[in-house]
Design a protein with these regions (language model features):
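Alpha-helical transmembrane segments and immediately membrane-proximal extracytoplasmic
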Residues: 1-431, 435-441, 445-476, 530, ...
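Helix-loop-beta junctions that constitute the ligand-sensing/allosteric loops
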Residues: 438-444, 450-475, 481-487, 493-540, ...
Length: 561
């Protein structure tokens, strides 16, 4: 039920986010998608000609810069790494304000000319919705992480009308796990979000293309070569993206809230020169697949998109890198296909098929998500005939990417912040204190307790061990059921003692501020079930391995021993 609700809200959120982008683009440019009419003057300000695009990123930056800096700094950038971090290191906890700030900031950035995608933001928005809902009903952490992944899957499904790709994206990139127990909830959310989006936006393929066929075996060799090139281009995109971001960090010395507006002037000049870079750029992508642009123009647009997206992120913009990687791949594939058709007319086939395969291959090279890459292009186009070329090129692109770079476009951002998701997670036991797990109401035995009374108390004790204290509640030692049972059996023929003083074991203790890991190490060394927690030599509670196991089972904690 929760997965269904997350999917429905994410689907509705994706619709609203898309409309918000279109509305703001209309305000800033006079048209719903300026990339469809690049270079046209603003219909409400015709006197400015095409120069108005220099100002739109500046105005947008003045609006979303303070919003991000003051409202939710984690809304800056492309969003997916923040969701990955929340799932892997924060138990799925994402502040509710992120959904609101990310929606407004990304819509302003894209509507104002930012050359980024809307998929990354909607993933973060959907994940924040899932996290907020899960925390509201107090689900355990394992379920909370799943609800975050449900939101991510719903975001991709609703944005692209691609429910299969949404599921795999959530499991391959967000959860980084294909466990069967996760699959059902993610599928429900993805399907629900897609149904909600289709009911409003319609059910049609993202790109309306003629059927492509691979008619010559030699064509597969060309697809393989394209995959190798795409893997290298994907890695190049990663390096340019973070290289420009580093450059902007070194150059900028002013307040962060002003950075998008000042940097927006540079972006505006770039848009003046290459208006096709305005916003997401899907119309340009579609035209490249259908063969509108010559090879030289395609390569120029590839370079321009790489720089425009990197600059948008570098100046503090908010938007995704999913769509730009598809755009770059389409330009590379279309240029490769047109060249192949000229050089090998009997082998190459349709140039458009290379553009589609290039989209998937560059995304795979950048994101290291080969299954998502294959499915996303398949669902975007509805073109099953290219499944084998897609699988071949994507596999090679992923392999080349691994050879050239350790990190993907998503994990690189986290590694630069000192977070390595591939490294073992910091142990929960090393970061939590005994105070959180001690039993302050544990029974203690007085030193003069009769043996029979001690036996009864130990019989009711969960760990069959109890601390023994003197009249000032200072710890004397620990009495175990084994020691008492030995005396009560009377096998050695000795007279039963009147009290327990002679049966008490002297043991090490822990303080409430000791780490859980240290306390567990002590239990392991002493082969004991529990240990007394003391403060100024007085017993304040009892810590046991049993309490740790109960806590882990209830919370399904990551990184536990």
């Amino acid at each position: 039920m929760l997965a269904l609700l997350v999917g429905a809200t994410t689907g509705a959120g994706a619709i609203g986010f898309r409309w918000l982008i279109q509305g703001l683009t209309l305000v800033f440019t006079g048209t719903g998608d300026y990339a469809a009419t690049p270079g046209a003057p603003h219909q409400w300000l015709p006197g400015l000609g095409r120069w108005f695009v220099v100002l739109t990123p500046v105005l947008a930056g003045l609006l979303y810069g303070p919003l991000v800096a003051l409202g939710a700094p984690e809304a800056r950038g492309h969003g997916v790494p923040e969701v990955m971090f929340a799932v892997a290191r924060r138990g799925g906890r994402i502040p509710p304000r992120v959904a609101v700030v990310k929606s407004l900031a990304s819509a302003l950035c894209i509507g104002g000319g930012g050359s980024v995608g809307r998929e990354g933001p909607i993933v973060q928005i959907g994940s924040a919705l899932g996290s907020t809902l899960g925390r509201a009903v107090r689900v355990p952490e394992d379920r909370l992480r799943l609800l975050v992944a449900c939101g991510a899957a719903g975001g991709i499904a609703a944005t692209f009308n691609a429910p299969l790709a949404g599921v795999v994206f959530a499991m391959e990139i967000i959860l980084r796990d294909f466990a069967a127990r996760s699959f059902g909830m993610v599928v429900v959310s993805s399907v629900t979000a897609s149904v909600v989006a289709r009911s409003v936006l319609g059910d049609h393929a993202f790109l309306d293309l003629p059927a492509f066929r691979v008619g010559h075996l030699g064509t597969y060799a060309l697809f393989a070569l394209l995959g190798l090139l795409a893997g290298g281009v994907g890695v190049l995109f990663i390096r340019v993206l973070y290289g420009i971001e580093d450059l902007c960090d070194r150059v900028w010395r002013g307040p962060e809230w002003l950075r998008p507006a000042v940097g927006g002037l540079l972006l505006g000049l770039l848009l003046l020169a290459v208006p096709q870079m305005y916003g997401v750029g899907y119309p340009v992508l579609g035209e490249s697949v259908t063969g509108r642009y010559a090879v030289g123009v395609l390569l120029f647009l590839l370079v321009a998109k790489t720089v425009a997206t990197s600059l948008t992120i570098g100046i503090g913009g908010s938007g995704g890198v999913f769509a730009p990687s598809l755009f770059i791949g389409a330009m590379l594939g279309a240029a490769f296909g047109q060249t192949a058709v000229v050089l090998l007319p009997g082998t190459a086939g349709a140039a458009g098929s290379f553009a589609l395969v290039g989209m998937a291959a560059v995304f795979a090279g950048a994101a290291r998500a080969p299954i998502t890459a294959v499915l996303i292009v398949f669902e975007l186009t509805g073109e099953y005939s290219l499944i084998l070329p897609l699988m071949l090129a994507v596999s090679l692109a992923t392999g080349i990417s691994h050879l050239l770079s350790r990190e993907s476009i998503y994990t690189a951002k986290l590694v630069r912040r000192g977070v390595d998701l591939d490294a073992p997670a910091p142990s929960w036991a090393h970061s939590h204190r005994v105070r959180a797990l001690l039993d302050p109401s544990c029974q203690v035995l007085a030193l003069d307790t009769p043996l029979e009374g001690a036996a009864d108390a130990l019989g009711a004790a969960p760990d069959a061990e109890l601390p023994v204290v003197d009249a000032d509640r200072r710890l004397v030692g620990v009495l175990t059921s084994g020691a008492v049972a030995e005396w009560l059996s009377g096998e050695d023929g000795e007279e039963l003692p009147a009290g327990i003083a002679g049966l008490v074991e002297i043991r090490a203790t822990v303080t409430a501020e000791a780490t859980v890991a240290d306390a567990l190490d002590l239990l392991e060394r002493s082969d004991a079930r529990g240990v007394a927690v003391v403060e100024d030599e007085r017993v304040i509670g009892w810590f046991s391995a049993r309490a740790v196991l109960v806590h882990i089972r209830r919370n399904d904690l990551p990184g536990t021993p």
